[in-house]
Curated annotation (Swiss-Prot):
Its main location: cytoplasm. The gene is gmk. This is Guanylate kinase. One of its GO terms (molecular function) is guanylate kinase activity. It is an enzyme of class 2 (transferase). Residues 3-183 form the Guanylate kinase-like domain. Its EC number is 2.7.4.8. The keyword Transmembrane helix does not apply. The keyword Transferase applies.
Length: 206
Protein backbone atom coordinates (compact mmCIF):
# COMPACT_ATOMS: atom_id res chain seq x y z
CA UNK A 1 0.00 0.00 0.00
CA UNK A 2 1.35 3.41 -0.96
CA UNK A 3 -0.95 5.47 1.26
CA UNK A 4 -1.30 5.37 5.04
CA UNK A 5 -4.44 4.60 7.01
CA UNK A 6 -5.06 6.97 9.93
CA UNK A 7 -7.50 6.94 12.81
CA UNK A 8 -8.37 10.29 14.36
CA UNK A 9 -10.14 10.14 17.72
CA UNK A 10 -11.08 12.72 20.35
CA UNK A 11 -13.68 13.53 22.98
CA UNK A 12 -16.58 15.74 21.93
CA UNK A 13 -15.46 19.38 21.95
CA UNK A 14 -11.75 18.75 21.38
CA UNK A 15 -11.93 20.11 17.83
CA UNK A 16 -11.43 16.91 15.86
CA UNK A 17 -13.96 17.73 13.13
CA UNK A 18 -12.57 21.25 12.66
CA UNK A 19 -9.03 19.88 12.32
CA UNK A 20 -9.90 17.21 9.79
CA UNK A 21 -12.00 19.65 7.75
CA UNK A 22 -9.13 22.16 7.70
CA UNK A 23 -6.68 19.42 6.69
CA UNK A 24 -8.93 18.31 3.82
CA UNK A 25 -9.36 21.92 2.70
CA UNK A 26 -5.60 22.53 2.64
CA UNK A 27 -4.52 19.32 0.89
CA UNK A 28 -5.70 17.92 -2.47
CA UNK A 29 -7.90 14.80 -2.61
CA UNK A 30 -5.04 13.08 -4.42
CA UNK A 31 -3.10 13.22 -1.12
CA UNK A 32 -5.62 12.77 1.68
CA UNK A 33 -9.26 11.73 2.04
CA UNK A 34 -11.76 11.13 4.81
CA UNK A 35 -13.39 7.71 4.70
CA UNK A 36 -17.16 7.92 4.15
CA UNK A 37 -19.14 5.46 6.25
CA UNK A 38 -22.16 3.39 5.24
CA UNK A 39 -25.28 3.71 7.39
CA UNK A 40 -28.84 2.42 7.38
CA UNK A 41 -30.33 5.51 9.02
CA UNK A 42 -32.26 8.08 7.02
CA UNK A 43 -30.44 11.19 5.74
CA UNK A 44 -30.78 14.30 7.88
CA UNK A 45 -31.44 17.74 6.46
CA UNK A 46 -28.40 18.89 4.48
CA UNK A 47 -26.82 15.43 4.20
CA UNK A 48 -25.96 14.07 0.76
CA UNK A 49 -25.43 10.46 -0.30
CA UNK A 50 -21.78 9.84 -1.14
CA UNK A 51 -20.59 12.96 0.66
CA UNK A 52 -21.67 12.62 4.28
CA UNK A 53 -22.59 8.92 4.23
CA UNK A 54 -23.47 6.11 1.88
CA UNK A 55 -27.10 5.61 2.84
CA UNK A 56 -27.86 1.91 2.55
CA UNK A 57 -30.93 -0.28 2.97
CA UNK A 58 -30.96 -2.52 6.05
CA UNK A 59 -30.95 -5.81 4.11
CA UNK A 60 -28.18 -4.56 1.82
CA UNK A 61 -25.98 -3.63 4.78
CA UNK A 62 -26.44 -7.07 6.35
CA UNK A 63 -25.53 -8.66 3.02
CA UNK A 64 -22.33 -6.59 2.93
CA UNK A 65 -21.51 -7.77 6.46
CA UNK A 66 -21.80 -11.40 5.31
CA UNK A 67 -19.52 -10.64 2.37
CA UNK A 68 -16.83 -9.23 4.70
CA UNK A 69 -17.16 -5.82 3.07
CA UNK A 70 -16.54 -3.78 6.23
CA UNK A 71 -13.28 -3.07 8.00
CA UNK A 72 -15.37 -2.35 11.09
CA UNK A 73 -19.07 -2.01 11.73
CA UNK A 74 -21.42 -1.46 14.64
CA UNK A 75 -25.11 -1.34 15.38
CA UNK A 76 -26.14 1.82 17.22
CA UNK A 77 -29.73 1.61 18.46
CA UNK A 78 -31.64 0.49 15.34
CA UNK A 79 -29.09 1.53 12.73
CA UNK A 80 -25.90 0.06 11.28
CA UNK A 81 -22.71 2.03 10.64
CA UNK A 82 -19.70 0.60 8.84
CA UNK A 83 -16.39 1.41 7.13
CA UNK A 84 -15.95 0.00 3.61
CA UNK A 85 -12.73 -1.98 3.23
CA UNK A 86 -12.62 -2.04 -0.62
CA UNK A 87 -12.98 1.74 -0.84
CA UNK A 88 -10.14 2.27 1.61
CA UNK A 89 -7.91 -0.23 -0.18
CA UNK A 90 -8.46 1.51 -3.53
CA UNK A 91 -7.47 4.89 -2.13
CA UNK A 92 -4.40 3.51 -0.33
CA UNK A 93 -3.26 1.73 -3.50
CA UNK A 94 -3.34 5.12 -5.28
CA UNK A 95 -1.00 6.60 -2.66
CA UNK A 96 -3.76 8.51 -0.88
CA UNK A 97 -3.73 8.81 2.91
CA UNK A 98 -7.13 7.89 4.34
CA UNK A 99 -8.54 9.16 7.65
CA UNK A 100 -11.12 7.35 9.76
CA UNK A 101 -13.08 9.48 12.21
CA UNK A 102 -13.95 6.89 14.88
CA UNK A 103 -13.81 6.45 18.66
CA UNK A 104 -11.25 4.52 20.71
CA UNK A 105 -13.36 1.35 20.61
CA UNK A 106 -13.43 1.36 16.82
CA UNK A 107 -9.70 2.09 16.85
CA UNK A 108 -9.13 -1.07 18.87
CA UNK A 109 -11.07 -3.15 16.35
CA UNK A 110 -9.15 -1.80 13.40
CA UNK A 111 -5.76 -2.05 15.11
CA UNK A 112 -6.33 -5.79 15.50
CA UNK A 113 -7.02 -6.14 11.75
CA UNK A 114 -4.56 -3.53 10.44
CA UNK A 115 -1.48 -3.50 12.73
CA UNK A 116 0.26 -0.73 10.76
CA UNK A 117 -2.63 1.76 11.07
CA UNK A 118 -1.50 5.16 12.40
CA UNK A 119 -3.55 6.44 15.32
CA UNK A 120 -3.91 10.04 16.52
CA UNK A 121 -5.74 11.32 19.60
CA UNK A 122 -6.78 14.96 20.03
CA UNK A 123 -6.87 16.40 23.56
CA UNK A 124 -8.21 19.78 24.75
CA UNK A 125 -5.81 22.09 26.64
CA UNK A 126 -7.85 21.78 29.86
CA UNK A 127 -11.15 20.54 31.24
CA UNK A 128 -12.31 24.12 31.66
CA UNK A 129 -11.66 24.87 27.98
CA UNK A 130 -13.41 21.68 26.92
CA UNK A 131 -16.51 22.61 28.91
CA UNK A 132 -16.36 26.16 27.51
CA UNK A 133 -16.37 24.81 23.96
CA UNK A 134 -19.31 22.51 24.66
CA UNK A 135 -21.29 25.35 26.22
CA UNK A 136 -20.33 27.65 23.34
CA UNK A 137 -22.00 25.37 20.82
CA UNK A 138 -25.35 26.37 22.29
CA UNK A 139 -26.81 23.01 21.31
CA UNK A 140 -27.23 21.22 24.63
CA UNK A 141 -28.72 21.72 28.08
CA UNK A 142 -26.45 21.98 31.11
CA UNK A 143 -27.48 18.45 32.07
CA UNK A 144 -26.48 17.12 28.66
CA UNK A 145 -23.18 19.03 28.80
CA UNK A 146 -22.44 17.48 32.20
CA UNK A 147 -23.01 14.03 30.69
CA UNK A 148 -20.80 14.89 27.71
CA UNK A 149 -18.04 16.03 30.08
CA UNK A 150 -18.28 12.77 32.01
CA UNK A 151 -18.10 10.81 28.76
CA UNK A 152 -15.18 12.94 27.55
CA UNK A 153 -13.13 12.20 30.67
CA UNK A 154 -13.80 8.49 30.19
CA UNK A 155 -12.69 8.67 26.54
CA UNK A 156 -9.54 10.63 27.38
CA UNK A 157 -8.29 7.82 29.64
CA UNK A 158 -7.58 5.89 26.43
CA UNK A 159 -5.20 8.49 24.95
CA UNK A 160 -2.23 6.22 25.74
CA UNK A 161 -3.47 3.61 23.25
CA UNK A 162 -2.65 5.96 20.36
CA UNK A 163 0.60 6.58 18.45
CA UNK A 164 0.34 10.37 18.42
CA UNK A 165 -1.27 12.91 20.76
CA UNK A 166 -2.06 16.50 19.73
CA UNK A 167 -3.12 19.15 22.25
CA UNK A 168 -5.60 21.40 20.45
CA UNK A 169 -4.95 24.70 22.25
CA UNK A 170 -4.00 26.98 19.36
CA UNK A 171 -5.83 25.69 16.29
CA UNK A 172 -3.17 26.64 13.72
CA UNK A 173 -0.47 24.94 15.79
CA UNK A 174 -2.55 21.78 16.14
CA UNK A 175 -3.21 21.72 12.38
CA UNK A 176 0.51 22.14 11.66
CA UNK A 177 1.28 19.25 14.00
CA UNK A 178 -1.31 17.07 12.26
CA UNK A 179 0.24 17.83 8.87
CA UNK A 180 3.70 17.10 10.31
CA UNK A 181 2.60 13.58 11.24
CA UNK A 182 1.55 12.90 7.64
CA UNK A 183 4.84 14.25 6.32
CA UNK A 184 6.95 12.25 8.78
CA UNK A 185 5.12 9.01 7.95
CA UNK A 186 5.58 9.58 4.22
CA UNK A 187 9.32 10.16 4.69
CA UNK A 188 9.96 6.93 6.58
CA UNK A 189 12.43 4.67 4.84
CA UNK A 190 9.88 1.89 4.44
CA UNK A 191 7.41 4.27 2.79
CA UNK A 192 9.99 5.91 0.52
CA UNK A 193 11.28 2.52 -0.60
CA UNK A 194 7.84 1.89 -2.11
CA UNK A 195 6.99 5.40 -3.33
CA UNK A 196 10.41 6.06 -4.85
CA UNK A 197 11.13 2.52 -6.01
CA UNK A 198 12.06 3.50 -9.57
CA UNK A 199 14.32 6.36 -8.47
CA UNK A 200 16.13 4.25 -5.89
CA UNK A 201 16.64 1.45 -8.42
CA UNK A 202 18.17 3.95 -10.86
CA UNK A 203 20.42 5.50 -8.22
CA UNK A 204 21.72 2.13 -7.05
CA UNK A 205 22.12 0.53 -10.49
CA UNK A 206 25.64 -0.71 -11.21
Amino acid sequence: MLGNLYILSAPSGAGKSSLINALLADLPRTEVQLSISHTTRQPRVGETHGIHYYFTEHHEFESLIEQGHFLEWARVFDHYYGTSLPMIERSLAQGIDVFLDIDWQGARQIREKVPNVKTIFILPPSRAELEKRLVGRGQDSLETIAKRMEQAVSEMTHYNEFDYVIINDQFKTALTELKSILTAERLKQSAQAIRQQALIAELLAE
